[in-house]
Amino acid sequence: MSIFTKSLLTAVCASSLVACVVKQDEAPDDLRRAIPTSDQVRINLPTGTARSLGELAEWYVATRKVTTTFNGGTAWVLVLVHTIVQFPVTSVDGDTYTWGPWSDALDPAEYKLDVRALGDGTYSYQLSGRSKTVAGSSFEVVIDGFADPRPGDLKGNGTFMIDFDAGKRVNPIDSDPDARGQVDVNYDLLARHLDLHIMSTDDAGNPVTADYAYNETATGGGDMVFNIEGDAGGTPLLEQITLRSRWEASGVGRADGRLAGGDLADGATASECWNETFARVYYEDSANFAPTEGNVADCAFATQDLPPL
């Protein structure tokens, strides 16, 4: 958990007029269940810790980095908001429930959470912050979300947006200095589906966009598609890069990749498979980037399957 998250949770407890272990009924009970936990909204990729990085299939490593980035980047949001709504509300104004504003004496920012009951059993929520380091600062929305708990426990759906630029303006001290842009997340717990859209910039200030789509199988496997526009050819021209990874609960999996556009007029595809210990058992590509290895018969998924361009 980040310093930013810890300071917020501490402020919530400190500002409550009652102990944090005390629950009040000012807010609807289903509001507390509306916000999913970080465990409910995550990409579940089997992991192994006993092998060195060099022994692992390269695209398993790439898939793991993508899932780790997503899980880590969104977990603190859900931990924070889900925890706050368990505490007594600070005020109620019609259909809007507010927690805060709160901050410790030495905190560089103060925050509040507003949750609105939309009348049909769904909720919208905003976590806003205001810098204490700049006189006259106004509250800015850092997290903006919508939650629909009506399908039942562990079956809800919703969306949330994280604005990293606003987060840094509100609290430049505790925020991640490398985080920029915004992330939009769409989740459906019943369908075991996640969508993620990122709008950011690279180190040179150039715009970067990326999309993730993830589906979890009933048996614990996964299917993830990652699309990003970036430089793979060494010139200012940008290529479209697609990586689709599929895996079973045991850990065996396959990743298929495609590069198109930019310097790669003819495009290129590649495939890699790994076993239960995440070691490569098969590799091939259409552009002779590297020699073919292994036997496709050892792949858990027999054929290449990429989404259309």
Residue ranges and their predicted role:
Residues 21-121, 286-309:
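N-terminal "mature head" segments of proteins
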Residues 141-244:
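Short helix-loop boundary/capping segments
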Residues 102-104, 128-130, 163, 199-201, ...:
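A generic structural motif
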Residues 95-101, 125, 160, 194-198, ...:
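Generic recognition of long tandem-repeat/solenoid scaffolds
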Residues 249-309:
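Hydrophilic extracytoplasmic domains
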Residues 1-8:
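Bacterial N-terminal signal peptides that target proteins for export
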Residues 16-19:
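C-terminal motif of bacterial Sec signal peptides marking the signal peptidase cleavage site
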Residues 81-173:
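Short N-terminal edge-element motif at the start of the domain
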